[in-house]
Amino acid sequence: MQNQLNALLQSAKKSVADAQSEIVLEEIRVDYLGKKGKLTELLKSVGQMPADQRPLLGKAVNEIKREIQQLLNAKSTQLREKSLQEKLNKEKVDITLRGRYDHLGAIHPISRVSERVSQLFSMLGFQIAEGPEIENEYYNFEALNIPADHPARTMADTFYFSGDKLLRTHTSPVQIREMEKQGVPIRLIALGRVYRRDLDQTHTPMFHQVEGLVIDKRSTFANLKGLLQQFLNCFFEKDVRLRFRPSYFPFTEPSAEVDIYQPRTDKWLEVLGCGMVHPNVLRNLNIDPDEYSGFAFGIGLDRLAMLRYEVTDLRLFFENDLRFLGQFK
């Protein structure tokens, strides 16, 4: 019996050592330690032995069983560690390799233009102000000398909420708020999103605008013309031809629209509106128009982006087509 046990142990050791997977290891366990396993069969035969030998043989069988189980456990741990190491080796990353840059994003062209405009006006001594996009009728219209019967105040042109709340149609309300807060003299620009009921090749219901304001005791229309010429020359990085046409805005008097000459098409394209601040706007803020004067201007940032990047349809900027936006990396 002892010889059989020793032979069985050696056979089990060899089988366990040769096992290369958990599945094979489980088959070995069943073959030796299962209900019908080799060691179980030997244990059954102990009852046929002389009574004085049974305790010793039973003890020997249990020791062999315990040793085989230990072999199985050790081999199982070894196989799991080997499997884990192989998996880690497959997933290993060489941190010295160059990264992939194929899908890096880029600053949106409207954001590029906005940053450029802010930078240029900061260099010209303007402070940059912001204000709420949801406004009331006083700041958006009344304080700017826009009467109640003006077409811009109709539902056809303006997005209204309940009461007197609306989506601002320009960034001029920021100028009113800043003059209330700071007083005069003042020199600022206000950039941001504005909203109007309009949609075609050169207009969208939401667009971006920068409006500038200068109020002091010596401002003239000549100062306004010189400032706009200098700004546009710097923005387009070349000398541009401008044309000032008489126009009408409720908040400026006199008023003008400014066109820029396009040599490629031999045409003039409107880029902004401007004028001297209307005395009524100053009076609304308790500023004496006999002592102070100033000028204001409004420029569509989207229109500037169209000109700078030679884009013919304004709506392309807002359609999130990566084929289009990828050109501006």
UniProtKB/Swiss-Prot annotation:
Extract the InterPro entries matched here: aa-tRNA-synth_II, aa-tRNA-synth_II/BPL/LPL, Phe-tRNA-synth_IIc_asu, Phe-tRNA_ligase_II_N, Phe_tRNA_ligase_alpha1_bac, Phenylalanyl-tRNA_Synthase, tRNA-bd_arm
Q: Does the keyword Magnesium apply?
A: yes
A Gene Ontology molecular function term for this protein is:
phenylalanine-tRNA ligase activity
- The Enzyme Commission number assigned here is 6.1.1.20
User: GO:BP terms for this protein?
Assistant: phenylalanyl-tRNA aminoacylation
Instruction: State whether keyword RNA-binding applies.
Output: no
Q: Where in the cell is it found?
A: Cytoplasm
Q: What is its main location?
A: cytoplasm
Q: Kindly list the cofactors needed.
A: Mg(2+)
Q: Which reaction does it catalyse?
A: tRNA(Phe) + L-phenylalanine + ATP = L-phenylalanyl-tRNA(Phe) + AMP + diphosphate + H(+)
- What class does this enzyme belong to in the EC scheme? ligase
Q: Which residues bind Mg(2+)?
A: 253
**Keyword annotations:** Aminoacyl-tRNA synthetase, ATP-binding, Cytoplasm, Ligase, Magnesium, Metal-binding, Nucleotide-binding, Protein biosynthesis
GO CC annotations, alphabetized: cytoplasm
Q: Which Gene3D superfamilies does the record match to this protein?
A: Bira Bifunctional Protein, Domain 2 (3.30.930.10)
Q: Any note on cofactor binding?
A: Binds 2 magnesium ions per tetramer.
Which PANTHER family does its entry note?
A: PHENYLALANINE--TRNA LIGASE, MITOCHONDRIAL, PHENYLALANYL-TRNA SYNTHETASE
| The family this protein is said to belong to | Belongs to the class-II aminoacyl-tRNA synthetase family. Phe-tRNA synthetase alpha subunit type 1 subfamily.
**Self-association state and partner proteins as the record states:** Tetramer of two alpha and two beta subunits.
Q: What is this protein called?
A: Phenylalanine--tRNA ligase alpha subunit
Q: Give the originating organism.
A: Coxiella burnetii (strain CbuK_Q154) (Coxiella burnetii (strain Q154))
List the top taxonomic levels of the source.
Bacteria, Pseudomonadati, Pseudomonadota, Gammaproteobacteria, Legionellales
